[in-house]
UniProtKB/Swiss-Prot annotation:
Function as written in the Swiss-Prot or TrEMBL entry: Alcohol dehydrogenase catalyzing the reduction of toxic aldehydes to the corresponding alcohols. Mostly active on ethanol (EtOH), but exhibits broad substrate selectivity for primary and secondary alcohols (e.g. cinnamyl alcohol, octanol, geraniol, butanol, propyl alcohol, pentanol, isopentanol, ethylene glycol, isopropanol, methanol and tertiary butyl alcohol). Also catalyzes the reverse reaction to convert allyl alcohol to highly toxic acryl-aldehyde. Required for survival and acclimation in hypoxic conditions, especially in roots.
GO molecular function: alcohol dehydrogenase (NAD+) activity; ethanol dehydrogenase (NAD+) activity; nucleotide binding; protein homodimerization activity; zinc ion binding
Chief location category: cytoplasm
Impact upon substituting F43Y: In strain: cv. Hiroshima
Mutant phenotype after disruption: Loss of alcohol dehydrogenase activity. Increased resistance to allyl alcohol. Decreased survival, associated with impaired lateral roots development, upon oxygen deprivation leading to hypoxic conditions. Impaired root acclimation to hypoxic stress.
Keyword Cytoplasm: yes
Post-translation changes: Glutathionylated.
Residues the record lists as binding NAD(+): T49, V206, D226, R231, T272, V295, V297, T320, F322, R372
Other known facts: Unlike most plants, Arabidopsis contains only one gene for ADH.
Keywords, in A-Z order: Acetylation, Cytoplasm, Glutathionylation, Metal-binding, NAD, Nucleotide-binding, Oxidoreductase, Phosphoprotein, Zinc
Taxonomic placement: Eukaryota, Viridiplantae, Streptophyta, Embryophyta, Tracheophyta
Induction: Transactivated by MYB2 in response to various stresses. By 2,4-dichlorophenoxyacetic acid (synthetic auxin) in Arabidopsis as well as in maize. Induced mostly in roots and shoot apex by hypoxia during water submergence or oxygen deprivation, in a MYB2-dependent manner, and partly via an ethylene-mediated pathway. Accumulates in response to hydrogen peroxide H(2)O(2) during the early stages of hypoxia signaling. Decreased levels upon combined hypoxia and diphenylene iodonium chloride (DPI, an NADPH oxidase inhibitor) treatments.
Sequence positions that bind an alcohol: T49, H69
Designated name of the protein: Alcohol dehydrogenase class-P
Length: 379
């Protein structure tokens, strides 16, 4: 029986309040409206961003809410005006979008869509501001326009990347956020040449994605920098050739790296959000050609300073959002990198849990035990 145009009742993991375990509830998911797509989610994974907003320590809490933004699924139905997607398509919902009409979308240099740029405070859909989720008639808020901790979700079509139907969704679902953020920061923004050296600041999931990018690019040395030495053995699996813990040195880490590399690395990628690490990442690149890329998100009031001579000596500092990938245009190509065995995804997946045990995924991340935990829907 077709569910097109009908309300679908399904299970979702609802966050009723900040920091409390998610509760599996039966929710009603309304049909997609104009420029929207309803997706059956098959696999989702937990990102640190989900945990950050679930804890709600640094922002206005918005509850009850359905979190989740790294996922893979199949289109169930499409709303009015959707022409590039149809039922049965294999897709990745993305936390940011590509309307295809704004100046950013028309620019080859930008992926910062005016309409669908990431918005953490919006609890409804762009079309009408309303939620497509409800329990007993009461709305449940969306998260990042994706809300993938639900067996069915409704997403703006501009936030949906159509991918190769042969790609295993339980693997490629992790491409839709953190991994691509790090990978693209290296491949698309830092752009190391084969044989060059790259320093990665922060060896969490995003930093390991950046290291994977350096490995794919053919970097000869990939130097990982982290305060947690327990991460070093794992980092070697991602192509990191040597690791440095700033706590082990009595001089600034940028000086340590400069001494290790005859004047500085060719490229650096900062993945922590620490202002101190941003300064270090910039000042550790070689003069004349060095490029540093900032990925980590700082606190709201943060600022940093560095001597202008660092720029005049031809060091370059760049920032990036989502690895400079346009969601609909570029993410299918990242999936193809996996399909042709250029990109290795399995090593990022450390745990798998059934949907009924989704809170275990939060435990693994809070304890620092996981890179990515796959949550199998319908299990």
């Amino acid at each position: 029986m077709s569910t097109t145009g009908q309300i679908i009742r399904c299970k979702a993991a609802v966050a009723w309040e900040a920091g409390k375990p998610l509760v599996i509830e039966e929710v009603e998911v309304a049909p997609p409206q104009k420029h929207e797509v309803r997706i059956k989610i098959l696999f989702t994974s937990l990102c640190h961003t989900d945990v950050y907003f679930w804890e709600a320590k640094g922002q206005t809490p918005l509850f009850p809410r359905i979190f989740g933004h790294e996922a893979g699924g199949i289109v169930e139905s499409v709303g009015e005006g959707v022409t590039d997607l149809q039922p049965g398509d294999h897709v990745l919902p993305i936390f940011t979008g590509e309307c295809g009409e704004c100046r950013h979308c028309h620019s080859e240099e930008s992926n910062m869509c005016d309409l669908l740029r990431i918005n953490t405070e919006r609890g409804g859909m762009i079309h009408d501001g309303e939620s497509r989720f409800s329990i007993n008639g009461k709305p449940i808020y969306h998260f990042l326009g994706t809300s993938t901790f639900s067996e069915y979700t409704v997403v703006h079509s501009g936030q949906v990347a159509k991918i190769n139907p042969d790609a295993p969704l339980d693997k490629v679902c992790i491409v839709s956020c953190g991994l691509s953020t790090g990978l693209g920061a290296t491949l698309n923004v830092a752009k190391p040449k084969k044989g060059q050296s790259v320093a990665i600041f922060g060896l969490g999931a995003v930093g390991l994605g950046a290291a994977e990018g350096a490995r794919i690019a053919g970097a000869s040395r990939i130097i990982g920098v982290d305060f947690n030495s327990k991460r070093f053995d794992q980092a070697k699996e991602f192509g990191v050739t040597e690791c440095v813990n700033p706590k082990d040195h009595d001089k600034p880490i940028q000086q340590v790296i400069a001494e290790m590399t005859d004047g500085g690395v060719d490229r650096s990628v900062e993945c922590t959000g620490s202002v101190q690490a941003m300064i270090q990442a910039f000042e550790c690149v070689h003069d004349g050609w060095g490029v540093a890329v900032l990925v980590g998100v700082p606190s709201k009031d943060d600022a940093f300073k560095t001597h202008p001579m660092n720029f005049l000596n031809e060091r370059t500092l760049k920032g990036t959002f989502f690895g400079n990938y346009k969601p609909k245009t570029d993410i299918p190509g990242v999936v193809e990198k996996y399909m042709n065995k250029e990109l290795e995804l399995e090593k990022f997946i450390t745990h798998t849990v059934p949907f009924s045990e989704i809170n275990k995924a939060f435990d693994y991340m809070l304890k620092g035990e996981s890179i990515r935990c796959i949550i199998t829907m319908g299990a």
